[in-house]
């Protein structure tokens, strides 16, 4: 598979690393622009960009993606099979979602539809959830509502905190991405059209599981 990887923070690194070491080809990385994060206003690259530079992978750090015709045309020219998206930091518009042959896949760190949206790991800890997990979904224009391709549940240990649980889920995301692609490739070989293992949550389920107000 020819893959373009979208990610920014440390959380994205296990997934990028597993694809770099896999049989798949990471033809480019898209990350957030460098930010001023230290004294002297020095620009610091994102963790994902830093890894891509070390691996000599083509890097894009657009300030704007929606309506960015030059960037969109550049992505189209790369003839990509799949976009892998994990903690990139922006919602991808329709004109980008439609570019890759097999769509855009995202890893979400909760058992959807619970904790759809921002900060799912934090909410699972705040609310004392016994279990959490990762879902791999095919992205659409809405937030965390795409078809669910693969999901795995894990127990939240009593001594888990934000750091330990974040690390567990980032590693699990990487594993599930590869598993989902293996299913896709198997179905391509069998001439079937989809690797769906689950269906999207119903509107009623989504209504029940909206993120609580921070007030």
Regions found by a protein language model. Give the residues of each.
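One-carbon transfer enzymes
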Residues: 1-200, 204
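Positively charged, low-complexity/disordered segments
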Residues: 203-205, 209-215
């Amino acid at each position: 598979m020819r893959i373009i990887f979208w990610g920014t923070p440390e959380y994205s690194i296990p997934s990028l690393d597993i694809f770099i070491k896999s049989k798949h080809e990471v033809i480019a990385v898209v990350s957030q622009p460098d930010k001023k994060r230290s004294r002297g206003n020095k620009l610091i690259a994102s963790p994902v960009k830093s890894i891509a530079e070390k691996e000599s992978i083509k890097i894009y750090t657009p300030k704007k993606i929606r309506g960015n015709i030059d960037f969109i045309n550049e992505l189209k020219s790369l003839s990509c099979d799949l976009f892998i998206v994990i903690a990139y930091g922006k919602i991808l518009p329709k004109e980008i979602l439609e570019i890759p042959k097999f769509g855009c896949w995202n890893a979400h760190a909760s058992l959807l539809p619970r904790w759809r949206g921002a900060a799912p790991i934090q909410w699972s800890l705040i609310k004392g959830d016994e279990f959490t997990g990762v879902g791999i979904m095919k992205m659409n224009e809405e937030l965390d509502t795409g078809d669910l391709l693969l999901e795995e549940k894990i127990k939240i240990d009593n001594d888990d905190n934000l750091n330990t649980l974040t690390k567990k889920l980032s590693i699990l995301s990487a594993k599930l991405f590869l598993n989902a692609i293996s299913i896709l490739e198997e179905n391509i070989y069998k001439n079937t059209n989809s690797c769906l293992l689950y269906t999207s949550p119903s509107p009623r389920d989504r209504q029940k599981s909206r993120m609580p107000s921070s007030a």
